[in-house]
């Protein structure tokens, strides 16, 4: 109590507001999930006008009209979170003027027709199983389960989604969207990383978005996508003359190649598991002098000139890895230790992809 009394009223109110905001951040996510599931961004986009009034919006949504009066409260949260802009039908001076809503650039990433839409990512990260895992951290810290996800759901993440085809599909869709963005940047900015290679294995490559882009850019390179049996079968994937899909387990065996590509794979795993994966990669590539290398696309925590939004995104991603996978985001020092423990000779970090970096690791 003495500590509280030492602070001014203004400081206490700011502290309380800060606590309330952080405690309530998950409510932004809940409102966002609701908007995506109801298709609110698409309804407003298809309206054909710069903004859509609240009454027009509620009439167009697939909801019980007896609950239509609640939509403005959900929209209020989303406006405050920066996903919509609220406008007034008149000059904004009268209280009875009806609200109308327009999309922000962030909201356009939630449109179904947007090639790089983030709908799947929103839905799978805000899945109840994910949220209850985050809410079980204190219990997990006191039990014997490897992850909070297992504490909350009774099984690990991979077994959980393997038993739920729709959830597994959503996960792979989210990865594919992310890969489309990364593939564009890789080919335009980091083409030199792949030049001279005759073969490459994309480990955990999912539906092959990145490998397909690489194979098209380098028609003389043989590209293989390695992923679990259910991923390869469920996606009904077709290869091309220089692109092949192989079902397998990176912990067991990886096909031989000049280079191995791992995009946002290692952050899902513990240090011990990462060392196992890297050692398996090292076994199937030639020595450095003959062009052998492992290509990582991963977050590298820390560094200079990162804005608050980027740092917050990195921290939140690390918390997700902690709760659901038992993995982690890593600093450059932590990456270097992993490479050393796996018996790799060196590495080079190239210009980053926002938070993520391209890292070449050598046998």
UniProtKB/Swiss-Prot annotation:
InterPro entries to which the protein is assigned, alphabetical: COMT-like, O_MeTrfase_dom, Plant_O-MeTrfase_dimerisation, SAM-dependent_MTases_sf, WH-like_DNA-bd_sf, WH_DNA-bd_sf
Enzyme type, top EC level: transferase
Cited CDD domains: AdoMet_MTases
Domain of life: Eukaryota
Biological processes per GO annotation: alkaloid biosynthetic process; methylation
PROSITE patterns cross-referenced by the UniProt entry: SAM_OMT_II (PS51683)
Keywords: Methyltransferase, S-adenosyl-L-methionine, Transferase
GO molecular function, one term: O-methyltransferase activity
Reactions performed catalytically: 10-hydroxystrychnine + S-adenosyl-L-methionine = beta-colubrine + S-adenosyl-L-homocysteine + H(+); 11-demethylbrucine + S-adenosyl-L-methionine = brucine + S-adenosyl-L-homocysteine + H(+)
Enzyme Commission number, as recorded: 2.1.1.397
Positions annotated as active site in the UniProt record: 267 (proton acceptor)
Gene3D superfamilies, per the entry: Vaccinia Virus protein VP39 (3.40.50.150), Winged helix-like DNA-binding domain superfamily/Winged helix DNA-binding domain (1.10.10.10)
Metabolic or biological pathway: Alkaloid biosynthesis
Residues at which S-adenosyl-L-methionine binds: 204, 227, 249-250, 263
Job description of the protein: O-methyltransferase involved in the biosynthesis of curare monoterpene indole alkaloids (MIAs), natural products such as strychnine, a neurotoxic compound used as a pesticide to control rodents, and its pharmacologically active derivatives, including brucine, used to regulate blood pressure. Curare alkaloids act as animal glycine receptor antagonists. Catalyzes the conversion of 10-OH strychnine to beta-colubrine, and of 11-deMe brucine to brucine.
Family listed: Belongs to the class I-like SAM-binding methyltransferase superfamily. Cation-independent O-methyltransferase family.
Protein name as annotated: Strychnine O-methyltransferase
Species annotation: Strychnos nux-vomica
């Amino acid at each position: 109590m003495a500590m509280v009394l030492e602070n001014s009223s203004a400081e206490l109110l700011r502290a309380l507001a800060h606590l309330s905001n952080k405690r309530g951040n998950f409510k932004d996510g809940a409102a966002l999930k609701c908007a995506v599931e109801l298709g609110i961004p698409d309804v407003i986009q298809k309206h054909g006008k710069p903004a859509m009034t609240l009454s027009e919006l509620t009439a167009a949504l697939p909801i019980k009209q007896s609950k239509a009066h609640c939509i403005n409260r959900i929209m209020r949260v989303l406006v405050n979170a920066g996903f919509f802009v609220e406008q007034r039908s008149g000059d904004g001076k009268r209280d009875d003027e009806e609200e109308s809503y327009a999309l922000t650039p962030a909201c356009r990433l939630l449109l179904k027709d947007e090639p790089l839409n983030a709908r799947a990512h929103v839905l799978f990260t805000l899945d109840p199983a994910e949220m209850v895992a985050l809410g079980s951290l204190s219990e997990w810290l006191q039990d014997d389960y490897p992850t909070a996800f297992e504490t909350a759901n009774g099984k690990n993440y991979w077994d959980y989604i393997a038993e739920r085809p729709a959830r597994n599909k959503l996960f792979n869709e989210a990865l594919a969207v992310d890969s489309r963005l990364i593939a564009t940047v890789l080919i335009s900015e980091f083409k030199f990383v792949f030049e001279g290679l005759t073969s490459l294995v994309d480990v955990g490559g999912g539906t092959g978005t990145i490998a397909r882009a690489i194979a098209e850019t380098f028609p003389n390179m043989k590209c293989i996508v390695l992923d679990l049996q259910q991923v390869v079968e469920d996606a009904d994937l077709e290869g091309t003359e220089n692109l092949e899909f192989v079902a397998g387990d990176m912990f067991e065996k990886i096909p031989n190649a000049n280079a191995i590509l791992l995009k946002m794979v290692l952050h899902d795993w513990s240090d011990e598991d990462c060392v196992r994966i890297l050692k398996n990669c090292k076994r199937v590539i030639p020595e450095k002098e003959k062009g052998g290398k492992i290509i990582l696309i991963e977050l590298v925590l820390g560094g200079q000139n990162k804005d608050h939004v980027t740092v917050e995104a990195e921290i939140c991603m690390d918390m997700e890895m902690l709760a659901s996978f038992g993995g982690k985001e890593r600093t450059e020092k932590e990456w270097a230790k992993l490479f050393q423990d796996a018996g790799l000779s060196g590495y080079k970090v190239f210009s980053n992809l926002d938070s993520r970096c391209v890292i070449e690791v050598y046998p």
